[in-house]
C-alpha cells in the first residue's frame, strides 16, 4: 500500500499561526494534523465555557482554516485536529458554517465521548484520553475534516494510519509504530531542532514543521518539507521521543508501545527512519484528566541588591508576616542570582519570590498588595519589586484518574450525522514495569576533568501533572558507556537538590543510549497551580546539563 504522509501544523494552542498554510504549500501531504490541547489548555477552555456554553474549543483553528480550507480541499489533504477541546460538536458545526460561507464542499465529522465532567462533580473539565479508532471511522466514511476533543496526542496519527492501511485493533506492532510517529509529530518543531540541546548544530531561527512518512508495516521516516528551516537528525528525534514519557512501556488506549524497542537511523539529510517498534495490548483503563479551580494566587518578587542579601531577605519576610498570617499556602524562594563585585546592577541583585495561595481571593489580593507596597520606604536599603502585586488571580489544579475502558462511550459522528460506536479494546494487559535491561561495560579508568554534563549529553524535560520527566541521552557509544553507570538516581538527586526528598525513578533505554528520569511531585498540583519557578519543568533538563561532574577526558 502507498506511503501515508502525515504532517503536523500545531504543537499547542498558540503555536505559529502560519504553520497550516506553510505545511499545505510546502510539499505533498495526505493528512495534516493539529494538536492544540495541553493539560493547561483544558483548564483555559473550561473557563471559556463558563462564560459562554457555546465556546470551549480552540478558536484560532477556525481563523487558520478560513485561510486554508480551500487550499486543503484543492490539494486533497485531510485535516485531523483535537482543536474541538471541550466542544468538538460545536467546532464541527462552526467548520461546516465556514465551509458553507466560503462555498467549499467539505465533509466534516467529529469524535465525542471523552467528556466525563458530569461524573466528576467539582471539576471544571474531566476528559478521558480516547484512542484513534473513532478518527479512523470518520475517515473511512469519507470525512475531509475530523474534529476531536481529548484524544491522546498520538491518536491524531494512529487514526489516519489505521484508516489508510486497514489495520485491525490487534495489530499492535503496527499501531505502536504509528504511536511513536504520532508522539514525534505532536509537539511540532520540537522534532526539527526547536528547543534542542544542541541547537547550534543547525539553523533553528525558524524551524519547519515535521511530517512522517508512514508505511503499512508501522515503520516511518520522520522528516520535513524541503527548503524549510531547522534540521532532523537522530538527536532531534531522540529528544522528542523522550519528551513527557515515563518507562519503557508507553501506554495508550489502543496499544502500549515499547520505547525500548525503537530503532532510529539517519536515512539521508533531514530524514530519520523509525523502526523495530513492538506493541502490546493496551491497559484496561483510560486516563482521565481532571481540571478544577484550586483557589486564588498572587506573587511578588522583591529585588535584593548588593550586600547583606540574606539579612535583607529575613527582614522583608519578618515585615510581611502579619499580612500572611491567614493565608493557607505561603512560599518564599530566594534566588541568588547576584554576583560579588558585579559590573551591572542586575548582576548585583538577588530575587526573593513570594507566592501565596488561598481559597479567599481577598486574602491574597489587596491585603498582600497593600502590605508589600507599604514597605516601599520602610524596609531594606534599595527596596523595590519587579512589579507590584495585583489582585488575586484564580489558579487551576490538574489530577489524573483512570476509568475502565468499557465505561466510556467513544462515538464517531460521521459527516452525514450517523453515530458509530467505537468498541473498547478487546484484549488488555495491566501495565507493569519492564525488567532492568543490561547495561554496557563501563569505560576503563582514566583521567577525568570537572565539566558540565551537557558537553557529552543532551536532555529534554517536561511535565505530566505534578511530575516531571528528564530524558538524557548520549551522542556516542563511549559516552553512553559512561553515562549509563555515572548518572544513577542518587547522582541525579545530588545534581538536582530540589529532587532530594522526592521519588526519582530511572528508566534506561539502551537502544536510544538514553536514561529517562521521572521526578514525582516536583511540580506540585501541576502547571496551572504555578507552584514552581519553572512550572512545566521545561528547563529542568538544561539545569541538569549545566551541572558539573568528573567526566573522562577522552569524552571531552
Identify the role of each PLM range.
Residues 1-22:
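N-terminal amphipathic/basic leader segments beginning at the initiator methionine
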Residues 101-113, 158-198, 485:
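Catalytic or ion-translocation cores adjacent to nucleophile or general acid/base/metal-coordination motifs
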Residues 1-3, 37-55, 73-75, 114-122:
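Gly-rich Lys/Arg/Thr-decorated short loops/hinges at beta-loop-alpha junctions or inter-strand turns
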Residues 28, 276-445, 450, 464, ...:
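C-terminal non-catalytic interaction/assembly regions of soluble proteins
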Residues 184, 188-317, 327-341, 499-515, ...:
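Active-site loops and adjacent core secondary-structure elements that bind or stabilize anionic groups
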Residues 115-148:
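An acidic, phosphate/nucleotide-engaging active-site surface
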Residues 82-86, 143-160, 459-478:
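Conserved phosphate/anionic-ligand binding catalytic regions in large, soluble enzymes, centered on
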Residues 27-45, 67:
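N-terminal glycine-rich anion-binding loops that anchor highly charged ligand groups
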Amino acid at each position: 500500500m502507498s506511503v501515508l504522509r502525515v504532517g503536523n501544523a500545531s504543537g499547542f494552542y498558540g503555536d505559529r499561526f502560519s504553520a497550516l498554510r506553510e505545511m499545505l504549500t510546502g510539499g505533498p501531504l495526505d493528512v495534516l494534523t493539529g494538536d492544540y490541547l495541553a493539560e493547561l489548555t483544558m483548564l483555559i477552555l473550561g473557563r471559556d465555557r463558563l462564560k459562554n456554553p457555546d465556546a470551549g474549543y480552540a478558536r484560532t483553528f477556525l481563523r487558520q482554516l478560513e485561510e486554508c480550507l480551500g487550499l486543503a480541499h484543492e490539494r486533497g489533504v485531510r485535516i485531523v485536529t483535537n482543536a474541538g477541546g471541550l466542544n468538538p460538536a460545536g467546532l464541527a458545526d462552526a467548520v461546516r458554517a465556514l465551509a458553507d460561507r466560503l462555498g467549499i464542499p467539505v465533509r466534516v465529522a467529529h469524535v465525542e465521548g471523552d467528556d466525563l465532567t458530569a461524573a466528576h462533580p467539582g471539576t471544571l473539565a474531566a476528559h478521558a484520553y480516547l484512542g484513534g479508532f473513532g478518527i479512523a471511522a470518520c475517515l473511512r466514511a469519507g470525512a475531509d475534516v475530523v474534529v476531536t476533543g481529548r484524544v491522546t496526542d498520538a491518536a491524531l496519527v494512529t487514526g489516519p494510519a489505521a484508516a489508510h492501511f486497514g489495520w485491525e485493533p490487534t495489530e499492535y506492532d503496527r499501531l505502536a509504530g504509528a504511536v511513536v510517529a504520532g508522539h514525534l509529530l505532536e509537539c511540532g518543531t520540537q522534532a526539527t531542532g526547536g528547543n534542542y540541546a544542541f541547537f547550534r548544530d543547525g539553523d533553528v531561527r525558524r524551524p519547519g514543521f515535521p511530517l512522517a512518512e508512514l508505511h503499512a508495516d508501522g515503520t516511518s521516516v520522520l522528516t520535513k518539507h524541503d527548503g524549510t528551516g531547522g534540521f532532523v537528525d537522530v538527536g532531534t528525534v531522540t529528544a522528542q521521543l523522550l519528551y513527557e514519557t515515563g518507562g519503557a512501556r508507553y501506554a495508550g488506549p489502543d496499544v502500549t508501545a515499547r520505547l525500548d524497542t525503537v530503532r532510529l537511523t539517519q536515512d539521508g539529510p533531514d530524514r530519520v527512519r523509525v523502526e523495530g517498534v513492538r506493541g502490546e495490548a493496551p491497559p484496561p483503563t483510560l486516563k482521565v484528566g481532571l481540571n478544577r479551580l484550586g483557589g486564588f494566587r498572587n506573587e511578588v518578587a522583591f529585588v535584593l541588591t548588593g550586600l547583606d542579601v540574606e539579612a535583607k531577605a529575613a527582614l522583608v519576610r519578618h515585615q510581611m508576616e502579619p499580612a500572611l498570617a491567614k493565608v493557607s499556602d505561603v512560599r518564599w524562594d530566594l534566588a541568588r542570582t547576584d554576583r560579588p563585585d558585579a559590573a551591572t546592577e542586575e548582576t548585583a541583585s538577588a530575587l526573593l519570590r513570594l507566592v501565596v495561595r488561598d481559597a479567599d481571593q481577598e486574602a491574597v489580593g489587596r491585603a498582600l498588595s497593600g502590605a508589600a507596597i507599604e514597605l516601599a520606604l520602610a524596609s531594606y536599603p534599595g527596596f523595590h519589586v519587579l512589579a507590584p502585586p495585583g489582585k488575586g488571580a484564580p489558579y487551576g489544579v490538574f489530577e489524573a484518574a483512570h476509568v475502565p475502558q468499557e465505561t466510556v462511550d467513544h462515538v464517531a459522528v460521521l459527516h452525514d450525522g450517523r453515530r458509530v460506536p467505537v468498541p473498547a479494546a478487546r484484549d488488555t494487559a495491566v501495565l507493569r514495569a519492564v525488567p532492568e535491561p543490561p547495561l554496557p561495560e563501563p569505560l576503563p579508568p582514566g583521567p577525568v576533568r570537572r565539566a558540565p554534563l551537557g558537553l557529552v549529553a543532551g536532555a529534554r524535560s517536561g511535565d505530566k501533572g505534578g511530575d516531571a520527566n528528564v530524558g538524557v541521552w548520549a551522542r556516542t557509544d563511549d559516552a553512553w558507556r559512561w553515562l549509563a553507570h555515572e548518572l544513577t538516581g542518587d547522582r541525579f538527586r545530588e545534581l538536582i537538590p530540589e529532587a532530594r526528598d522526592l521519588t526519582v525513578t530511572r528508566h534506561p533505554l539502551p537502544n536510544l543510549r538514553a536514561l529517562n528520569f521521572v521526578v514525582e511531585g516536583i511540580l506540585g498540583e501541576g502547571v496551572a497551580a504555578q507552584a514552581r519557578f519553572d512550572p512545566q519543568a521545561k528547563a529542568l533538563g538544561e539545569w541538569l546539563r549545566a551541572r558539573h561532574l568528573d567526566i573522562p577526558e577522552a569524552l571531552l
